[in-house]
Amino acid sequence: MRVKMFKPLRLVLLIAVSVLLMAARMPNMRVVPWQQVEVPTQNILLDIAFTGTTPSHGWLVGDKATLLESRDGGLHWQVRELPGLEPEAYLASISFAGAEGWVAGQPKILLHTLNEGSDWTSIRLNNQLPGEPLLIQALGPGAAEMVTNVGAIYRTEDGGQTWHAQVDEPIGAIKNIARGPEGEYLAVSSRGSFYFLYTPESRTWKPYPRESSRRIQNMGFGPHGSAWKLNQGAEIAFTDDFTSGQWSSPLRPGRALSFGYLNAAYQNDHDLWVVGGGATLIHSPDGGKTWEQAKKLSNIPANFYSIEFFGPEQGFILGQRGTLLRYVSSNNS
């Protein structure tokens, strides 16, 4: 029996099949400029930073009180243990401005250094602090901004002795947050149904519902006022103006993966890298128009949780089981 399809339906199916075929043919990178680095831990790595005074002096933080130090730009790492830090401490974020650095984590953890980490002191946080520290940003001598996992934002100008609220009301549980170049924030609600935008002049969070049927996983800022958004199901969307609330139709680069995308970062104005579960790493050389995959890394038994660039030639990928990858080009190999 022949089945005659309605033409619009036939067109939709044709487009769907074409998209799947194109996805299946995502080219593989001929040269993968990433090198796995051995680190002395099997714990989850959560954040990385380098000091502003010695660019080769870096620090890694993670769960289970993980604190690692490098003196050679991230090639080799050594464990640093701090007295008084509980074994189950969750060190979520680290940031430096010059020689001054900060580490924020849970439960109610805030560490401070004035000498590139040679000495760390613990700063007591008020038990009434809404939520737990999720992100810390060093801003200059004595100054830093801290965000909790319910969207409370606080700033200090005196080395952490006093903190001043920067937002009138928190927003409830969030799972991911990113800070923009001028102090803006994009935060994703814990269930991924909403995202929120904060700008310093507003003192409030503005909510936006998800536009896709898939929940939001993560968000971040791009060059020149742009932003990216990762949805569950390996979707990516873009906007040229992160304050507009208007996004492109979601893309699904690559074949239909069982692993989702978890984080992304721009290397420069046009090179975009996306990481995800199952050692997923894809790259776009043109801001999201075309894509290629780093299939060579798929044998690494870890999820890639985050990626960060400190300049076009210095980048790192962090993941579970102590997984660390370093960007390697002809200039820093």
Curated annotation (Swiss-Prot):
UniProt main location, coarse: other
Protein keywords: Photosynthesis, Photosystem II, Signal, Thylakoid
Gene Ontology terms describing biological process: photosynthesis
Pfam families attached to this UniProt entry: PSII_BNR (PF14870)
Gene3D superfamilies reported in the protein's UniProt record: YVTN repeat-like/Quinoprotein amine dehydrogenase
Subcellular localization: Cellular thylakoid lumen
Secretion signal span: 1-25
A GO CC annotation given for this chain: plasma membrane-derived thylakoid lumen
Job of this protein: A factor required for optimal assembly of photosystem II (PSII), acting in the early stages of PSII assembly. Also plays a role in replacement of photodamaged D1 (psbA). Assists YidC in synthesis of chlorophyll-binding proteins.
Oligomer status and interactors: Part of early PSII assembly complexes which includes D1 (psbA) and PsbI; not found in mature PSII. Binds to the lumenal side of PSII complexes. Interacts with YidC.
UniProt comment concerning the protein's domains: A 7-bladed beta-propeller torus, about 55 by 55 Angstroms, with a depth of about 25 Angstroms and a central pore.
Family: Belongs to the Ycf48 family.
UniProt cross-references to HAMAP family, sorted A to Z: Ycf48
Protein name: Photosystem II assembly protein Ycf48
Gene encoding the protein: ycf48
